Amino acid sequence: MSHTSILQFRTANCKNCYKCIRNCPVKAIRVTNQQAQIIEEQCILCEKCIAVCPQHAKVEHDDIPAIQRVIASGKKVIASVHPAYLARYGWNSIGDLEKYLQKMGFWQAFDAAQGAAVMKEEYTRLLREQQQKKLVISSNCPVVVRLIRTRFPNLTGNILPILPPVEVAARLAKQDFC
């Protein structure tokens, strides 16, 4: 998926206020033909531009129609649910939410926190094995990883070689349910 498919601009809404440009931490936005555009190679996908745009000209890509098509096709779809979602929307447990998601057509729901637990064990192991004391950077946050790779490439080797928790959770869900 390209970055322009994740962050999208509604060109008709842009009023050239430049708030997105002023607030982008990596200066990955330029104006061309009076429309803000993301410089893909520099964007770290932090979504700061979405948060500050008073015109709502920047939006996240909506995957809901694609998910609905996959569910409608009859495939077994597993929802990987981040624990923050449960807290934010007042669900008591993944089980309660799973019932709701199944009514919407999902086959199962999986608690993505399980991926973080596995990742924590791997981080602990790697840090214990580390011979030399050096700066290490977690691979947990894709924005941080992208920032390091685009702005501080000399630190790329300091990123711990561990899959992000969402990927670990997806693999665990596949193991458990497929």
Positions of the model-derived regions?
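Iron-sulfur cluster-binding cysteine motifs and their immediate structural context
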Residues: 2-9, 15-44, 48-64
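Short, surface-exposed ligand-recognition loops at beta-strand->loop->(often short) alpha-helix junctions
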Residues: 12-14, 90-91
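Iron-sulfur-associated redox domains of electron-transfer enzymes in respiratory
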Residues: 61-178
